[in-house]
Curated annotation (Swiss-Prot):
One term of GO molecular function: mannosyltransferase activity
Alphabetical keyword list: Cell inner membrane, Cell membrane, Glycosyltransferase, Lipid A biosynthesis, Lipid biosynthesis, Lipid metabolism, Lipopolysaccharide biosynthesis, Membrane, Transferase, Transmembrane, Transmembrane helix
Topology in membrane: Multi-pass membrane protein
Cited function: Catalyzes the transfer of the L-Ara4N moiety of the glycolipid undecaprenyl phosphate-alpha-L-Ara4N to lipid A. The modified arabinose is attached to lipid A and is required for resistance to polymyxin and cationic antimicrobial peptides.
Pathway note: Lipopolysaccharide metabolism; 4-amino-4-deoxy-beta-L-arabinose-lipid A biosynthesis
Recorded family membership: Belongs to the glycosyltransferase 83 family.
Main location: membrane
Originating organism: Shigella sonnei (strain Ss046)
Compartments where located: Cell inner membrane
Name by which UniProt lists this protein: Undecaprenyl phosphate-alpha-4-amino-4-deoxy-L-arabinose arabinosyl transferase
Length: 550
């Protein structure tokens, strides 16, 4: 009966965090709008080989992530949940692997359930796992690969070892098809310390080639198809998206070596109090094979991405699966022997909640700021934000009431965040970061437009997805579409600022022409170097400028 209650609680937890509130949050640009539109175009065109964005070739990532996103929109429709369905599914599958692997290591159902709940409630996992990017997919394949390798190395027969390594190759191949060759580097780096300490080189060299073969066979069909359709894909993807992004001096998202330290700290909430003890206990028990494996899985990718010049928080998502298992194991030990770390965790959550309450007041209309984040008419959003942090502090306090029994309720600290964050976003943020909000406000003007031009790729993708059209034209800036715009068949999909007046004269009689521009809050629209318009509609950071036929 207790197991049934735990399962019901887990399903309720998943529903409240990962299912019910997802549709209440508008899509963020540039990431969510980009991936939503790529998948919409894939469904509309039926082309499941070459990814396109705004009808242009888009070679920043391989195809597998777009497949999953497209299936999500196919099943649930072109809506907020449909766009995010793929990443939620991948996150829940990763949690299922955490459950399975924890059971495999410790044969403890309670520990397995706890590891799963910790993983799903970690701030970084929840933030990325409900956000339509490709990282939850690659995290799933990496976690699946680590589970497959362990399965292979623990097998006692050649058939079991062979099956494990073949499965490892398939997961690595799918990882390559999701986000590239990092799906090969990360698992190799993660397992090497364990292989070295356990002296398991023989099995690795005897059976490792099976993983190589299955990986190649997994990638080969699509790899050959894309090479035949677009011969430049692999050159661009390998050189620009791998070498330049991670290693060269002009790498994207450059950050210092210590960048991931605050990411780990913030990402570990609401379980931050367990982080030092989990890592220390893991190191202290390093003679235990499974603990070494989890430590290596956690630390090696962190070191690898810390050395790389290009860094983003999403890159280390897979590390938190192993960290959740270490935390769960340590938490049960602490509850049994010395609950000090659990008390500290409760106080950290209380402190975080109260800090958020104070910060919300400071940036509210009633705070000391001359330009508050929320305006007076958005009072309900301020109260939603207060509720988020109040619930965080409340559950932090509740874990202290009988810490040996109630400490696990820290998993409910982010409950307010999950349910209310979509209702607390300030209008000034929505107007710049949520193109759907802009489309709602300007639908009647946008819908009949013959041509729509914009200077932001993220806004362009949002307009295209909301209006169900892929012919948005880039104005003044090419952004990440620069490569696709270089192809001869993309002629006419970009208009520079100097060319706009002539372009307008040539096309004005064909129908309504709409410019959607991103501007600074204090920027004077009249100072824009554009021909006089027939209509202007400013929505804070986004401006709709319209030209009608004469």
């Amino acid at each position: 009966m207790k197991s049934v209650r735990y399962l019901i609680g887990l399903f309720a937890f998943i529903a409240c965090y990962y299912l019910l509130p997802i549709s209440t949050r508008l899509l963020w640009q540039p990431d969510e709008t980009r991936y939503a539109e790529i998948s919409r175009e894939m469904l509309a065109s039926g082309d499941w080989i070459v990814p396109h964005l705004l009808g242009l070739r888009y070679f920043e990532k391989p195809i597998a992530g777009y497949w999953i996103n497209s299936i999500g929109q196919w099943l649930f429709g072109a809506n907020n949940f449909g766009v995010r369905a793929g990443v939620i599914f991948a996150t829940l599958l990763t949690a299922a692997l955490v459950t399975w692997f924890t059971l495999r290591l410790w044969r403890d159902k309670r520990l397995a359930l706890l590891a799963t709940v910790i993983y799903l409630s970690l701030f970084i996992v929840y933030a990325i796992g409900t956000y339509a990017v490709l990282d939850p997919f690659i995290a799933f394949w990496l976690v699946a690969g680590m589970c497959s390798f362990w399965l292979a190395m623990q097998a006692q027969t050649w058939k079991g070892k062979s099956a494990g390594f073949l499965l490892l190759g398939i997961t690595c191949g799918m990882g390559v098809m999701t986000k590239g060759f990092l799906a090969l580097a990360v698992p190799v780096l993660s397992v090497l310390p364990w292989v070295a300490t356990q002296k398991r080189w023989k099995d690795l060299f005897i059976y490792g080639w099976l993983a190589v073969i299955s990986c190649v066979l997994t990638v080969l069909p699509w790899g050959l198809a894309i090479a035949q359709r677009e011969p430049d894909f692999w050159h661009y993807f390998f050189w620009v998206e791998h070498i330049q992004r991670f290693a060269l001096d002009d790498a994207q998202h450059r950050a210092p070596f210590w960048y991931y330290v605050p990411v780990i700290i913030a990402g570990s909430l609401p379980w931050l109090g367990l982080l030092p003890g989990a890592l220390y206990t893991g190191w202290k028990n390093r003679k235990h094979s499974a603990t070494v494996y989890l430590l290596s899985w956690t630390i090696m990718p962190l070191l690898f991405f810390s050395v790389a010049k290009g860094k983003l928080p999403t890159y280390i998502l897979s590390c938190f699966a192993s960290l959740a298992m270490l935390m769960a194991h340590y938490a049960l030990l602490a509850a049994k022997n010395n609950p000090l770390a659990l008390r500290i965790n409760g106080w950290i959550n209380i402190a975080f909640g109260f800090t958020g309450i104070i910060a919300t007041f400071v940036v509210s209309p009633w705070g000391p700021m001359n330009t508050p984040v929320w305006q007076t008419f958005e009072s309900y959003k301020v109260f939603c934000a207060w509720s988020i942090f109040s619930l965080w502090a409340f559950f932090g306090w509740y874990t202290l009431t009988n810490v040996e029994k109630t400490w696990s309720f820290a998993a409910l600290c982010p409950l307010g965040l999950a349910l209310l964050v979509g209702f607390s976003i300030p209008d000034r943020v929505m107007e710049g970061k949520h193109p759907q909000f802009f489309v709602e406000m300007t639908q009647e003007s946008l819908q009949p437009s013959r041509y729509i031009l914009t200077d932001s790729v993220g806004v362009a993708a949002g307009l295209a997805w909301s209006l169900q059209r892929d012919d948005i034209i880039m104005y003044r800036q090419t952004g990440e579409l620069k490569y696709g715009l270089n192809y001869p068949d993309a002629k006419g999909r970009f208009v520079s600022g100097d060319e706009f007046a002539n372009w307008l004269n040539q096309h004005r009689q064909e129908g309504i022409i709409t410019l959607v521009l991103s501007v600074d809050r204090d920027e004077d629209i009249n100072s824009l170097a554009i021909p006089p318009a027939d209509a202007i509609d400013r929505q804070e950071r986004l401006v709709l400028i319209q030209y009608r036929p004469k």
